[in-house]
Amino acid sequence: MTIVAEVEIPAGFVPQYAMAFGAVDAPAVAVHDGNPLPVRLLKKPAGSVPLAGSLGASGLAGPFLPELDRPIWVTLSGDWSGTVDLLRSVDGGVTKFPLTAGGARWARFTANANEAAAEESEVGASYYLFATLTGGTLTYRVAQ
């Protein structure tokens, strides 16, 4: 929509119909696609509490309660063998499902790792680590 304003006597100016900005003692410039506001979004550090610990035998760790729209990082370290799965729940942990991508298992680890495994968009979802260890001690951290 184009807004046309006419200069009428006795005024020698036309009020802006849109936001404008400018430097001190400089003319104001209208905001438009070619001249956006000089701002950038700042994201504060995540407020979610990391899930961290170690397992010397098979077991379940969790829950991790993520903030929305942030990557969920899984860090696994130590001298361990077995498999570790990142599980997701939307009912407070009553049921937990493995992550999948295109129907194939996702976020299943058999070695030390440090990677973004998921990003959450549903309020109330929680994450768990399920380890099936055949030896050693696993040190884990799930965080944002």
Task: Name the predicted role of every residue range.
Residues 87-89:
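Conserved Ser/Thr-centered positions that define the repeating blades of beta-propeller domains
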Residues 26, 34, 69, 81, ...:
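Surface-exposed or flexible loop/turn and strand-edge residues in extracellular/cell-surface modules
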Residues 60-67, 100-144:
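Beta-sandwich interaction modules
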Residues 25-28, 36, 93-106:
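Tryptophan-centered short beta-strand motifs
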Residues 1-62, 66, 71-75:
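Extended, low-complexity segments enriched in Ser/Thr/Gly and acidic residues that occur primarily
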Residues 80, 91-93:
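Acidic glycine-/aspartate-rich tracts in secreted/extracellular proteins
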Residues 81-83, 114-115:
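Short, surface-exposed coil-to-beta transition loops
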Residues 66-79, 85, 127-132:
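Hydrophobic beta-strand segments within beta-rich accessory/binding domains
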